[in-house]
């Protein structure tokens, strides 16, 4: 069996909350790796009974040694956790397995008893299945940890509330750069090396795609980012442009390069997924052009006369490479957010929750982030401005069309977006769109300038406002934090067309 790692952060977060999970049922769809097992063991120490836990994994992120260790603890692990049929799409296979797993687990764990059931999901499939099968009387709270999963369920009438870890500020601000670094490191370790002259396309300008671009641009002559959302960046006519790239990295969580574009790809192109499942490149269509390979981590060479491409990791995310541990100690942040969400879900009153998909409270997030910085990861390892744990935030709810500040005004606050969408305009032209987890306002505070852009809400939004003096005090005592802040500010100034010399 594989040894189980430990995360001091998760234990510290749980120890600081006076709650007990005795009698709670946990049904989960998760990566069956050391990270998840470590979190579950921490939950066992606050009363969760392993016999009340049922989990199902995904073929590309299930390690057999971890499965054995989980079963030795008394956890029920579904036999189809590592099932893989290469000529069938993963989502089709997985949904079928999850439907059976949930029906069997619900019947077995809830028969003859009244108990709170927490559904912990990665990808939205478990929550969607539960919503279709259960009636309104079920005592259920859901948790979703991925943006793709949140998108899958956000329009569904599930009949129970879902805690939205996926779009929490802490996850977006801190985890995305860490995952981007891991994806990049893993991808390039598994190739012979990519020349600096290679043209790279990243599909998806979300948190992961943007962080990947930041990592790759200093190393390569051409790194383009494609996103179909309005206002994200310079449009790319993908069908006409796709043949010009040597490497394509998918980070949309959806199908960014469908089968209809496969024969337009440049010969020898390298395809790597940085999202979830195998949907980024319609990978099943590429796998059907090859002899079936039962190893979902195989790098597949597709060369059938019409398509010449290498599909890394059979189209699955390259940061899952078959190892028992995905990432390093920095994964403690994600595990702590999930553990805190399980504790919250165990006692939350559904009728009193503010919305069907509430965010984990910013106070909880700040507590977790502060502990994360102190216990597990040096500040220098983070490439986003770490300010969620500072006291002094004021929560703002703004209507669509509301202007936070105007270009040329005096700068006196820093902002973090909890939910909604805002846009930044320079001379009346939209230059940037901002969503949950984004922060803004630091550039002018650091440079002692007036506002270089106007920022207004595109839809009803919730923000957290920090006074400029508190912002300055936080940076004054921490040289590493100050350096990160200046780096972010320089990027913002250049995006707005201002001179970097204004920072001096």
From Swiss-Prot:
Keyword list, A-Z: Cell membrane, Membrane, Transmembrane, Transmembrane helix
Disulfide-bonded cysteines: none
Main location, first listed in the record: membrane
GO molecular function terms listed in the Swiss-Prot or TrEMBL record: DNA-binding transcription factor activity
GO cellular component: cytosol; plasma membrane
Pfam families, per the entry: cNMP_binding
Positions with a binding annotation for a nucleoside 3',5'-cyclic phosphate: 372-492
Claim: DNA-binding is one of the keywords in the record: no
Bilayer disposition of the protein: Multi-pass membrane protein
TM segment ranges: 146-166, 196-216, 330-350
Tree of life domain: Bacteria
SUPFAM superfamilies named among the record's database cross-references: cAMP-binding domain-like, Formate/glycerate dehydrogenase catalytic domain-like, NAD(P)-binding Rossmann-fold domains
Cellular compartment(s): Cell membrane
InterPro entries: Adenosylhomocyst_ase-like_sf, cNMP-bd_dom, cNMP-bd_dom_sf, Env_Response_Regulators, NAD(P)-bd_dom_sf, RmlC-like_jellyroll
Keyword Cell membrane carried by entry: yes
Full protein name: Uncharacterized protein MT0113
Source organism per UniProt: Mycobacterium tuberculosis (strain CDC 1551 / Oshkosh)
């Amino acid at each position: 069996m594989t040894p189980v790692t430990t995360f001091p952060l998760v234990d510290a977060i749980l120890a600081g909350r006076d709650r007990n999970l005795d009698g709670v049922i946990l049904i989960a769809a998760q990566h069956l790796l050391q990270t998840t097992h470590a979190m579950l063991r921490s939950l066992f120490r606050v009363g969760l009974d392993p016999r009340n836990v049922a989990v199902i994994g995904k073929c590309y992120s299930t390690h057999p040694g971890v499965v054995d260790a989980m079963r030795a603890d008394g956890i029920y692990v579904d036999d189809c956790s590592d099932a893989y049929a290469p000529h069938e799409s993963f989502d089709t296979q997985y949904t079928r397995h999850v439907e059976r797993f949930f029906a069997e687990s619900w019947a077995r764990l809830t028969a003859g008893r009244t108990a709170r059931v927490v559904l912990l999901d990665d990808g939205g499939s478990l929550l969607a299945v539960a919503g279709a099968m259960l009636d309104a009387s079920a005592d259920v709270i859901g948790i979703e940890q991925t943006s793709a999963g949140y998108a899958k369920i956000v329009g569904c009438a599930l009949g129970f509330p879902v805690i939205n870890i996926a779009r929490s500020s802490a996850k977006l601000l801190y985890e995305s750069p860490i995952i981007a670094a891991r994806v990049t490191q893993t991808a390039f370790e598994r190739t012979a090396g990519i020349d600096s002259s290679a043209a790279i396309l990243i599909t998806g300008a979300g948190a992961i795609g943007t962080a990947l671009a930041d990592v790759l641009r200093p190393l390569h002559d051409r790194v383009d980012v494609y996103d179909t959302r309005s206002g994200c960046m310079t449009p790319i006519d993908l069908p006409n442009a796709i043949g010009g790239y040597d490497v394509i990295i998918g980070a949309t969580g959806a199908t960014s390069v469908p089968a209809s574009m496969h024969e337009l790809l440049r010969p020898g192109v390298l395809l790597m997924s940085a999202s979830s499942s195998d949907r980024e490149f319609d990978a099943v269509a590429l796998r059907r052009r090859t002899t079936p390979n039962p190893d979902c981590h195989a790098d597949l060479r597709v060369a059938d006369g019409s398509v010449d491409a290498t599909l890394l990791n059979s189209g699955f995310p390259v940061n899952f490479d078959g190892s028992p541990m995905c990432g390093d100690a920095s994964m403690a942040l994600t595990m702590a957010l999930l553990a805190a969400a399980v504790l919250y879900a165990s006692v939350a009153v559904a009728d009193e929750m503010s919305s069907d998909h509430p965010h984990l409270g910013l106070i909880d997030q700040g507590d977790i982030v502060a502990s994360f910085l102190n216990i597990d990861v040096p500040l220098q390892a983070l490439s986003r401005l770490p300010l969620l744990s500072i006291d002094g935030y004021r929560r703002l709810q703004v209507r669509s069309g509301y202007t936070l500040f105007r270009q040329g005004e005096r700068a006196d606050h820093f902002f973090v977006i909890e939910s909604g969408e805002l846009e930044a305009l320079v001379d009346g032209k939209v230059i940037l769109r901002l969503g949950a987890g984004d922060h803004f306002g630091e550039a002018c505070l650091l440079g002692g300038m007036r506002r270089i852009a106007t920022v207004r809400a595109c839809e009803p939004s919730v923000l957290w406002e920090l006074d400029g003096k508190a912002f300055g005090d936080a940076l004054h005592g921490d040289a590493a934090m100050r350096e990160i802040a200046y780096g972010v500010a320089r990027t913002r100034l250049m995006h707005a067309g201002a001179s970097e010399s204004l920072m001096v």
